[in-house]
Amino acid sequence: MTPIAERPTDVASRTVPGHWEGDLIKGARNRSAVGTLVERTTRLVILARMEGTDAVSAREGFTRTLRHVPAALRKTLTYDRGKEMAKHERLAQRLANQVFFADPHSPWQRGTNENTNGLLRQYLPKGTDLSGYTQRELNAIAYQLNTRPRKCLNFATPLEVFTQLCHHSPVALGT
């Protein structure tokens, strides 16, 4: 388990894209979950349907979802120390990225993700059975958040900024 203190310094500055924060939001009686991923530079949100709340479900859900992101834009993932990330080594191996863990009881170290989880509760209220949501429905929710202008992005949307990086920035993509 690699602590956040060993994370590259460019992650904190948000100047280099490809660094993600991840978490699970849990549903009714902690029996269902949705994986949340937020890219730190662009604030792009990706939601992953989970089959359960265990480590295998988290690994499979995050792997399935992050495989659609260009390799150059999935460098690191910062997570809390929840038991659902017990299989993080296999996730890192499958995606060829590094996984870092925030210090215990330090949600501010993943503030972008915590803020996003709060925004998601507008669409996925606490106490909801999240297992009933399809990946298509989760993608529609993520689209709503990704097309919302953000002050921190000079009122561009996360989707606009991320798309621009994917299509127009050879430096950001390492090509």
Segments (PLM) and residue ranges:
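Active-site beta-loop-alpha junctions of metal-dependent nucleic acid enzymes
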Residues: K26-N30, L47-A71
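C-terminal domain-tail junction helix/linker
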Residues: K126-T175
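Mobile-element integrase/transposase regions
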Residues: M1-V34
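RNase H-like two-metal-ion nuclease catalytic core shared by retroviral integrases
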Residues: Y79-A92, F101-L124, S131-Y143
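Short catalytic-loop micro-motif centered on adjacent basic/acidic residues
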Residues: L47, K75-T78
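Short small-residue beta-strand/loop micro-motif enriched in glycine and branched aliphatics
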Residues: R43-A48, F101, K126
